[in-house]
Amino acid sequence: MASEPQQPSPYPYATPDQPRQLTDEDLTLLSHYTGEKDLDKLREHVLNIWKAVKAKLWVYACIQRLMFLQPRIPTHDFYPQALAALKSDPDLLVLDIGCCFGQDTRQMILDGVPTESITSTDITSDYWEFGKDLFKDRDTLAVHEAFGSFTDPAFTAAGGPLGHLSGRVAFAWAGAVLHVLSEEDVRAFAKHVYKILASGGVWFGTCVGSEPAGEWAATPNGDAKRYLHSPTSLKALLQHIGFSQVDVVGSMPAEMSSMNDDMVQSGGQKTMLAYTARK
Ligand SMILES: C[S@@+](CC[C@H](N)C(=O)[O-])C[C@H]1O[C@@H](n2cnc3c(N)ncnc32)[C@H](O)[C@@H]1O
């Protein structure tokens, strides 16, 4: 299971017993979604979940930093367009790929996307199950869910867990996923996203990038090196696969400048990439 570390964590900051202090802003989504207004109660709840996750699972940098509380999908320029379409046509389908705890799934629900339209998927159900405790919706969450690797052709092929969606998905979202994959796996992942999209469907997402592109830390199972694309190399890959109207933009949000200081130092200058690509 990918969430079980086969190697020591590459993050020098992944060892403290306590995470950083939670701000009120960190708790905005959780408070809106659960209806819990007592933020101190939520702080304690998050801390308990974080400790349980840390004891059992691979702790990605974004988990260590409690970034799973903050929805990422609203930060993408394409989201308003996808949201408007999904709200106006309940037949349109959306995937949250690499959903982890599922903060973006919950954000879409809060924003009015019909739960029937959403499929949340990840290589493992481990974080997702903790997400049901975190968001306190184990008995009410009505989105579709499917678990397996998007790099595996069988996952999206006929008869596979997502085979029934092949060629039918209007929007595929992948927040902060590509940078945990090897170069070969990014290619396979992108091919399978292309396949599952309907004609005219859009893949949009974010990932850590590097200028120049290159290998980075080891993947969680230790088998390969993760690959960080540059805007140019990711655009070329997506166009090669068949996507059109590909747009890849690099930026340097505050969280990234600190990552350049304390993440494993290899490859070029790290940036955050936001991409949009149409089938
Ligand atoms: C860095 S986390 C980002 C999670 C979340 N989307 C976010 O924005 O916070 C990367 C996620 O990708 C998932 N993942 C890794 N490899 C995957 C694969 N081959 N197929 C699907 N999901 C994968 C991980 O399990 C993890 O949940």
What are these regions (language model features)?
Residues 163, 167-185:
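A short SAM/SAH-binding and catalytic strip from SAM-dependent methyltransferases
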Residues 2-165, 184-186, 192, 201-279:
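Class I (Rossmann-like) S-adenosyl-L-methionine-dependent methyltransferase catalytic domain
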